[in-house]
Amino acid sequence: MEYPNLLPRFLKYVKVNSRSDENSDRFPSTEREENFQKNVIMKDLEELGLSDIHYNQKAGSVIAEIPSNVDYDVPVMGFLAHSDTADFNSENVKPQIHKNYDGESKIQLGDSEFYLDPEVYPNLRKYKGQTIITASGDTLLGADDKCGISELMTFAEYLMNHPEVKHGKIRLAFTPDEEIGTGAEQFDVKDFGADFAFTVDGEAPGKLGDCTFSAAQFTLDIQGVNVHPAVAKGQMINAVQVGIDFHNQLPEHDRPEHTDGREGFFHLLSFDGTVDHAHLAYIIRDFERDGLEERKNLVKSIVKKMNDEFGTERIKLQMNDQYYNMADELKKHMDIVDLARDAYKAEGLEVNEDPVRGGTDGSQLTYMGLPCPNIFAGEENMHGRYEYTVLESMYKTVDVMIKMAELNAERAK
């Protein structure tokens, strides 16, 4: 089905800079995120006539409700989308609309030197005859997750205007700081008030995320000894070299650029240093909890061995878990996954449940007592200048959400 207000909403939202900041001490991490939520999202919800619209200051989230239109109890379903965008230029986004794509040509990003090439991004070929939306080459688009925000709004608009579609109470949430991994930690599950939910933050139509990485992160702070190179023999300890030596003891294959499918990895995010001091930041990913623990233990053992060789704690390790594979918990709630599967199939989609090589807010929320798989939103090539979405994919997301609302009510009779 086509939804005439979806594209204008999306274009409006992507032009608002709501980039999060992992180095911030405030929550939400940026004032611009909070302004986007309060001044744009809340106003649009009010115009749609939803109920219980409020900003939860502690959670940094906008909450709203689509009231039930049936006279019997239905499990309360929720949908979530995040308001922030990733760590890439988000200022002055200029969306470009490419109608009736021919499925073969390169798509120039604005007037820039950059192109979306189907030889590099073969998914483009699937969208022959459809409308591709890109940025202009110097920013990201913000499809992740302003696709989801636009779809939640359009879904709400449709249900409010079509009482013939029977559904129970539906809760909506617009959350901050997903891209930096801190938004879900503060989410108020009780205030949200749903029995189960879905994040709307996935890729191409058919993608259903019910299996994610388990994740940890760690940092190393290395204290070196700086001595003039002329007299350094036997005295200098180069902190940068110590960092290199540590990194080279991790499995060479287990890096993002060498892995796919269900393979995990160690990923060096940053390495800053001088002879005197170095700082390394890593993330660890594995689909199995045991595998995650094995990787963490390997890091600890390497650090211990190197410190033992130095005879002092020259390398300081800080490590913490981030989230766990939602599949382990969703095994107890397969009726929720089945609801999504059935809605996909009813809308003519082939369900793709390949493991998600990442995490979503739902990964954490599931372990906070809110079972929360992820459904597709039409996001492609997220987090950079080559990001794009497809208008027809966004339409299909709304179709699926409407069908899920109907099925949830039917099954409660």
Curated annotation (Swiss-Prot):
<dbReference type="GO" id="GO:0005829">
    <property type="term" value="C:cytosol"/>
</dbReference>
<dbReference type="GO" id="GO:0006518">
    <property type="term" value="P:peptide metabolic process"/>
</dbReference>
<comment type="similarity">
    <text>Belongs to the peptidase M20B family.</text>
</comment>
<dbReference type="InterPro" id="IPR036264">
    <property type="entry name" value="Bact_exopeptidase_dim_dom"/>
</dbReference>
<keyword id="KW-0378">Hydrolase</keyword>
<dbReference type="InterPro" id="IPR011650">
    <property type="entry name" value="Peptidase_M20_dimer"/>
</dbReference>
<keyword id="KW-0645">Protease</keyword>
<dbReference type="GO" id="GO:0008270">
    <property type="term" value="F:zinc ion binding"/>
</dbReference>
<comment type="function">
    <text>Cleaves the N-terminal amino acid of tripeptides. Shows broad substrate specificity, exhibiting maximum activity against hydrophobic tripeptides, with the highest activity for Met-Gly-Gly. Therefore this enzyme may play an important role in flavor formation during cheese ripening. Is also able to slowly hydrolyze some hydrophobic dipeptides, but displays no activity against tetrapeptides and the tripeptide Phe-Gly-Gly.</text>
</comment>
<keyword id="KW-0963">Cytoplasm</keyword>
<feature type="binding site">
    <location>
        <position position="383"/>
    </location>
    <ligand>
        <name>Zn(2+) 2</name>
    </ligand>
</feature>
<dbReference type="InterPro" id="IPR001261">
    <property type="entry name" value="ArgE/DapE_CS"/>
</dbReference>
<dbReference type="InterPro" id="IPR010161">
    <property type="entry name" value="Peptidase_M20B"/>
</dbReference>
<dbReference type="GO" id="GO:0045148">
    <property type="term" value="F:tripeptide aminopeptidase activity"/>
</dbReference>
<dbReference type="Pfam" id="PF07687">
    <property type="entry name" value="M20_dimer"/>
</dbReference>
<dbReference type="GO" id="GO:0008237">
    <property type="term" value="F:metallopeptidase activity"/>
</dbReference>
<feature type="active site" description="Proton acceptor">
    <location>
        <position position="178"/>
    </location>
</feature>
<keyword id="KW-0862">Zinc</keyword>
<feature type="binding site">
    <location>
        <position position="144"/>
    </location>
    <ligand>
        <name>Zn(2+) 2</name>
    </ligand>
</feature>
<keyword id="KW-0482">Metalloprotease</keyword>
<keyword id="KW-0031">Aminopeptidase</keyword>
<feature type="binding site">
    <location>
        <position position="144"/>
    </location>
    <ligand>
        <name>Zn(2+) 1</name>
    </ligand>
</feature>
<dbReference type="Pfam" id="PF01546">
    <property type="entry name" value="Peptidase_M20"/>
</dbReference>
<protein>
    <recommendedName>
        <fullName>Peptidase T</fullName>
        <ecNumber>3.4.11.4</ecNumber>
    </recommendedName>
</protein>
<feature type="binding site">
    <location>
        <position position="82"/>
    </location>
    <ligand>
        <name>Zn(2+) 1</name>
    </ligand>
</feature>
<feature type="binding site">
    <location>
        <position position="201"/>
    </location>
    <ligand>
        <name>Zn(2+) 1</name>
    </ligand>
</feature>
<dbReference type="GO" id="GO:0006508">
    <property type="term" value="P:proteolysis"/>
</dbReference>
<keyword id="KW-0479">Metal-binding</keyword>
<feature type="binding site">
    <location>
        <position position="179"/>
    </location>
    <ligand>
        <name>Zn(2+) 2</name>
    </ligand>
</feature>
<dbReference type="InterPro" id="IPR002933">
    <property type="entry name" value="Peptidase_M20"/>
</dbReference>
<comment type="subunit">
    <text>Homotrimer.</text>
</comment>
<feature type="active site">
    <location>
        <position position="84"/>
    </location>
</feature>
